[in-house]
Amino acid sequence: MPQVPGPRPEPRAGNISQVRIDTSSPEQTEALGRRLGKLLRAGDIVALSGDLGAGKTVLARGIAEGAGAAGYIASPTFTFIRAYRGAVTVYHVDLYRLDRPQQLEDLGLDELLDGTALVVLEWAEKAGPLLPPEHLWITIRFRNGDDTRAVEFLPRGPRYTDVVQTVARECASWR
């Protein structure tokens, strides 16, 4: 599938705010998402990246649950966007099937990023210039074994640095 041009943040050597947490099962990945979701609020943006099947939707489900979203959290692959109401409105966006920049405008992604809801973007590298400078970039990578994942947090901005440091402390026993 063609890629929509856009930034793909990569870790830089010496970036002390970057954190990696390894998870050993989908359940643990979802639990990590719940811990993260409890720290997030309306206006926050979480950008998820990783190979197909790496666990982006599993982590997104945990984030939405942790933020207080009601109901079953499902992948929006074919609907592109799912909205969940609760303590915080959560927009779960899946950009996997996008192949043209114009489709971002058609979806109204810029309107979703207006600060009124928590937005979780899967395949965030396709969001291109619509992704604001301050956000939380998370890359999920396959590790040794079928279920083991490396969840790499790269905060962009002081708010997200604080969030990541808190999650890292809470999950210190997982590393």
Language-model features, listed with the residues they occupy:
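Conserved lysine of the Walker
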Residues: 56
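Pre-Walker A adenine-sensing motif
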Residues: 30-39
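Conserved nucleotide-sensing/catalytic segment adjacent to the nucleotide-binding pocket
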Residues: 73, 77, 83-123
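Hydrophobic anchor at the beta1->P-loop junction of P-loop NTPases
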Residues: 46-48
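Short phosphate-coordinating micro-motif centered on Lys-Gly-acidic
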Residues: 2-6, 10, 14, 19, ...
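Walker A (P-loop) phosphate-binding loop of P-loop NTPases
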Residues: 53
